[in-house]
Amino acid sequence: MNFETIIGLEVHVELKTNSKIFSASPTEFGADPNTQTSVIDLGYPGVLPTLNKEAVNFAMKAAMALNCEIATETKFDRKNYFYPDNPKAYQISQFDKPIGQNGWIEIEVGGQKKRIGITRLHLEEDAGKSTHTGEGYSLVDYNRQGLPLIEIVSEPDMRTPEEAYAYLEKLKSIIQYTGVSDCKMEEGSLRCDANISLRPVGQEKFGTKAELKNLNSFTYVQKGLEFEQARQEKELLSGGIIQQETRRYDEATKKTILMRVKEGSDDYRYFPEPDLVELYIDEEWKEQVRASIPELPDARKARYVAELGLPAYDAHVLTLTKEMSDFFEETVAGGADAKLASNWLMGEVLAYLNKQQKELKDVALTPAGLSKMIQLIEKGTISSKIAKKVFNELIEKGGDPEEIVKAKGLVQISDEGTLRKIVTEILDNNAQSIEDFKNGKDRAIGFLVGQIMKATKGQANPPLVNKILLEEINKR
């Protein structure tokens, strides 16, 4: 029997506002525990929440970027549950009137494009953070309590873990472009839960789902779904029954582990938040927010292909993150050739960042520096090989490419007379290589070029070297 995998994702995104959603408490990450709280966050008797308009603007902006319909009437509700990191014993969220719904984004996997539906996007407040010491007690930090969140619930439209990974990558990219969140999973500003079930191919009814938690990276989302997919298939093929469970992904064993069995759906006893009035969003407000949405990744990707002549793959990689795309834009605006800028960013720059586990903002390289270096290559002042030495200096220490070239004596040798003299000396000392080349051994020319580059410390103009070398060989 063959099975079809059904995957849906719930993503929580922390909004980058200066204050919390219902209080004036600050939102800075990394502050000392319990130093960014207020009586409103902690639910003291008699205090009243005040809605942060910027959080509403950010939620609308994200919803619009995700092609959602924006509600004209929306409201907040109390979601009732008790947990130590929830001091009010309820969370202010949205139940039946979310701020956005019926959206979609387009992903691409294996060259195939697919539209993934978004059921809803709603606003809510975050809970505090519990730390379990393992010594008989737990600690709670309420700094996170009351931070503004949007929850983005997808339709169960994904059929493979690869599609789930692509969805998350695209979702993160769009949200980052809007500027409403930095989407840093390591800081908790983007969190994801996954729901997965299997059903026989051709069957319309969904199978029993498992919910996966503790997914701390997009890679873990994919790996957790892959394991769960295999686990459920094995269970069904052996005649077993899938129970509705909450499971967590264990990074060490690369398996999902049972947390609890769900006998029914959670009953949070939602009811309208009595301390907040309904919110009415008119067309003028919507248009103001819509006008603030910048160029999004798909539009940039199309522009890079149409106007800059980049291959679709290059355009895709460059627009994955706004940081990289903005860096590319500034590099080209500084006068660098678009394709050369793309090659350097996708090659040397990404390789360095991946190796050092850094982001562009963490290195000394600037768009202006990269642009000037590329223009030195285009002018023939330095070769691509020498440029790598300049690049290493720029990304580690910064500086002006022209000054680095002069200080290190890296100017490319393009004087024909100087190069011809060096070529002649190399040929005089390598008669056998000349003979090998004339006998059809093409590798011999590579050896000779290598000797010339060694003699010039890599500073010889490669095209000119090849030209002179062939001329001098043909004379012999």
Curated annotation (Swiss-Prot):
Top-level taxonomic group: Bacteria
Family, as annotated: Belongs to the GatB/GatE family. GatB subfamily.
Subunit structure: Heterotrimer of A, B and C subunits.
An example molecular function term from Gene Ontology annotations: glutaminyl-tRNA synthase (glutamine-hydrolyzing) activity
Organism lineage string: Bacteria, Bacillati, Bacillota, Bacilli, Bacillales
Family annotation (Pfam families): GatB_N (PF02934), GatB_Yqey (PF02637)
Keywords, alphabetical: ATP-binding, Ligase, Nucleotide-binding, Protein biosynthesis
Protein name: Aspartyl/glutamyl-tRNA(Asn/Gln) amidotransferase subunit B
Role played: Allows the formation of correctly charged Asn-tRNA(Asn) or Gln-tRNA(Gln) through the transamidation of misacylated Asp-tRNA(Asn) or Glu-tRNA(Gln) in organisms which lack either or both of asparaginyl-tRNA or glutaminyl-tRNA synthetases. The reaction takes place in the presence of glutamine and ATP through an activated phospho-Asp-tRNA(Asn) or phospho-Glu-tRNA(Gln).
Enzyme class: ligase
The enzyme's E.C. designation: 6.3.5.-
NCBIfam families according to UniProt: gatB, PRK05477.1-1, PRK05477.1-2, PRK05477.1-4
Cited PANTHER family: GLUTAMYL-TRNA GLN AMIDOTRANSFERASE SUBUNIT B MITOCHONDRIAL AND PROKARYOTIC PET112-RELATED, GLUTAMYL-TRNA(GLN) AMIDOTRANSFERASE SUBUNIT B, MITOCHONDRIAL
GO biological process: glutaminyl-tRNAGln biosynthesis via transamidation; translation
Catalytic reaction(s) noted: L-glutamyl-tRNA(Gln) + L-glutamine + ATP + H2O = L-glutaminyl-tRNA(Gln) + L-glutamate + ADP + phosphate + H(+); L-aspartyl-tRNA(Asn) + L-glutamine + ATP + H2O = L-asparaginyl-tRNA(Asn) + L-glutamate + ADP + phosphate + 2 H(+)
